[in-house]
């Protein structure tokens, strides 16, 4: 299974080994491999398991092997099989209780690297949300998706007013998400990439879009991609405020946490997230 990657469950036998592991390899579809290679997705995930996994303050899978050829992007990750954990159905929408737990978890990660995220991008461990690859690629693919979407579906008037101008606005939206203070961003933090253990604690998976930028991006992405419109409208400000409070609780320097500026970043990122359903 998988879109940007092919995932396999491998059964193991023998002493001192788990009964199964998950093996992640490049996708079977050549177009998906091309896109994933261009966006350095395989390199990012391999680097996560090599450089960051032991520093993560949130639950993530155990990694057993991680290798990548940076010239060809051939890669392999062997990780813990979490198939026994509870999943949240993104099509149904995450419950508010699960959402609150997920917000607190990602706040712990953001707090650990708050104001220090740029170094990760400079070291090649992450890709900045302001990286030139995004404005080079996204306006074109958004334009293609928008043309197809508007020819086949009826859309709300508010979206129809924004869509024709969105590709032109994308570079500015992207640059606004790296004005700082920057931190480590999961990049794909949504219900499909969150499992819940026996204590109902979230376990984050899929680190192929690991990035550096404003942590508000992860929050906006999570809210817009994981909650129903009704739940999001009712709770988004509460979830945002919970995140800001949790940043300081988990160690982000209070002097670098500007609630008003972060709310603006959140709103900008939420607008940017229109790109995902259109491109998909």
Task: Name these PLM-found stretches.
Residues 1, 13-18, 117, 161, ...:
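Regulatory N- and C-terminal appendages and interdomain linkers associated
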Residues 1-73, 197-202:
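Conserved NTP-binding catalytic cores of kinases and kinase-like/nucleotidyltransferase enzymes
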Residues 3-12, 22, 169-215:
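Active-site acidic catalytic loop and adjacent metal/ATP-binding pocket
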Residues 31-35, 87-92, 204-205, 221-229:
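Glycine- and acidic
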Residues 47, 209, 215-253, 270-280:
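Active-site activation/catalytic loop segments of kinase-like enzymes and analogous catalytic loops
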Residues 66-68, 116-130, 254-262:
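Short, glycine/acidic-rich hinge or "gate" loops at secondary-structure transitions
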Residues 74-84:
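Conserved short submotifs of the Hanks-type protein kinase catalytic core
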Residues 85-186, 198:
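ATP-dependent phospho-/nucleotidyl transfer catalytic cores
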